[in-house]
Amino acid sequence: MVASRLAAGGLLLLALLALALDGKPAPPQPLRKAPAGGTTAWRRELTEQPEGASRPAAGGGGGGGRSGSKAANAAPTAPKSKGGAAAAAAAAARLMRDLRPDSKQARAAWGRMVHPEHHAGGGGGGGGGGGASRRLKGVAKKGLGKGCFGLKLDRIGSMSGLGC
């Protein structure tokens, strides 16, 4: 009953949408051709700036530090000298690297989104993880080794579901 009313409402909305458009399809958009130079041409296209962007940004904070967000750091600045062109190319390369969907960081972020319960683990250095990922020393290390079946107690209950 509810499904039929929902379907009828959807059809009514589609009919009203068709009347609002007067049956005219949208004009076709011309296809944009890819540059012949591949990724090099894309980088060149990214470094080209419109006329309005050639002025320096307000605030004067143009240092080379990495304290801002990635989007602020990736924005190409106007070249001031011959070295400025290299800086603009580096900014464009950084933008391309950040937008790449198959990078290591993107895969790690996707894994954390899909499996949030496994994020507390964590491997080597570089932070992240939480308190469970630090190595135990001294007495705590000796007590941890003799668990169920000679395996670590924290692994048995959490991952396999065996428990002791």
Swiss-Prot record:
This is C-type natriuretic peptide. Expressed by the venom gland. InterPro entries: Natr_peptide (IPR000663), Natr_peptide_CS (IPR030480). Disulfide bonds join 148-164. One of its GO terms (molecular function) is toxin activity. It comes from the Eukaryota. Its main location: secreted. Residues 58-67, 121-132 have a biased composition (Gly residues). Residues 1-23 form the signal peptide. One of its GO terms (biological process) is receptor guanylyl cyclase signaling pathway. Residues 68-93 have a biased composition (Low complexity). Keywords: Cleavage on pair of basic residues, Disulfide bond, Hypotensive agent, Secreted, Signal, Toxin, Vasoactive, Vasodilator. It comes from Philodryas olfersii.
